[in-house]
């Protein structure tokens, strides 16, 4: 069996590591560097450049040089994040694919999906590993931001496949970093906060490292993040400042000059790096542009204090997910024993200072922020290959998953921060008599209202035998694998007929969607509870109306006309109440119908008892409804149903 390599597929840079005996080792690329820029360029001659070679020619070939592709992977073109944060920040063309995904195009019109471009970076990683090992490499563990959704994970696996790699596992970046730290750590039980601020994404994970029966158990307690916060945004803030200053001095806006823009972008990134160790730097770009009076030069002095003032809001943005991660883990800042900094952007002194202030302790400096994630991926590869035997990794899913049920409510089957892999089943039923089919509507998010969450997909379970509502037993199963990818199935327990769906990348969630869901859930917790209580009252009322009318019909002549009229009047009043939003009115009318129906129910019960005695005490068995059956508002897919 060949080696399973570990790849950190980053927004800005990527890194490769392999297990060398019992130790993970970072492998240098052909240029002698331990990290490779995640940049791909297509030249006029048809050559594809990857890494440093692509980055070097970006200034002269901005339309065909693709960077920060990770921010597009698994996303829809119409996503607000794509429109606002990507299209306005990159010189290359971002287009809408036929399936609605965000793709890129060269100036010659060649269209490419983000996984295709990312695959070029992975292909270089694969070649580097093969050159080092002297044997073919076909399997890999690839890392993704912890807050990547299902479609982004699927798209990352697709990129691996395009590159000729079987992706044995998708692992979360902070978890990989903790894995790298945990293997070397021999300090017993620890609770570690992994603060991962990379080139394009931010993650925070709270992770417990413990010795369990001689094994190093690494368990993720919670995770949070922002997939649109990273070093690229810091570069952009400085780039815009330089362009604005140049405009003040020269009256020329460089935003419309792609070549100049690329030069300023590179200068901003270089200045940012220098300001992590120096108090000030000069950005000097001669012949940046020209007008009627001659060539113009950009020469601007930037101090560390000025740069920090430009990006302080970005640093502060990273602290809110940290608070949420602690809350979800049920921990306070004092419970954290170690803070790990991962990602190149954490080299910035301001980031280190704010993280220290937030957690109240000095972050560790002995973890290489650029390499820890790849090292962790290699260790996970070693675990999967059987080469590393004393590590147990328990990761989590970042968002709750469930289905839409009666009254437009989301019924959660798997809560956020549940350890994966996991499988959860629940029995649901039909909402109408003789309903031949149900539609399973799969949702992702934190809100009570189904419409306020993200729709991941729908599928139908047909050919349900005719039966009264509430009788069919439809078992819905959610199965999340170790990669965090979801499979949903529905089975009619009476017939054994089953239907399933693997959530595809066409149902991607933008980070804005995810963040909005969590924020909305917290901000609207009270409104959600009221809505939930109102829907519960409506469902109770609907069930009572249905059962009351059905009983009257079955009892026939045993019920007087006056009794029938009284029941029907109470049903109509309750129906009218359910159309409104007054929970108390619904509950009041429900009680009135119960009281009106009580004498008839007692009479019917007495008659049934007499009939049973007459039949020699024979006891009629009725099908038993499972206790956890939830009435689901499934839509009938039969076209001619009235």
UniProtKB/Swiss-Prot annotation:
Keywords: ATP-binding, Chaperone, Nucleotide-binding, Phosphoprotein, Stress response. Induction: By stress conditions e.g. heat shock. Residues 628-642 have a biased composition (Acidic residues). Belongs to the heat shock protein 70 family. InterPro entries: ATPase_NBD (IPR043129), Chaperone_DnaK (IPR012725), Heat_shock_70_CS (IPR018181), HSP70_C_sf (IPR029048), HSP70_peptide-bd_sf (IPR029047), Hsp_70_fam (IPR013126). The modification Phosphothreonine is found at residue 201. The gene is dnaK. SUPFAM superfamilies: Actin-like ATPase domain, Heat shock protein 70kD (HSP70), C-terminal subdomain, Heat shock protein 70kD (HSP70), peptide-binding domain. This is Chaperone protein DnaK.
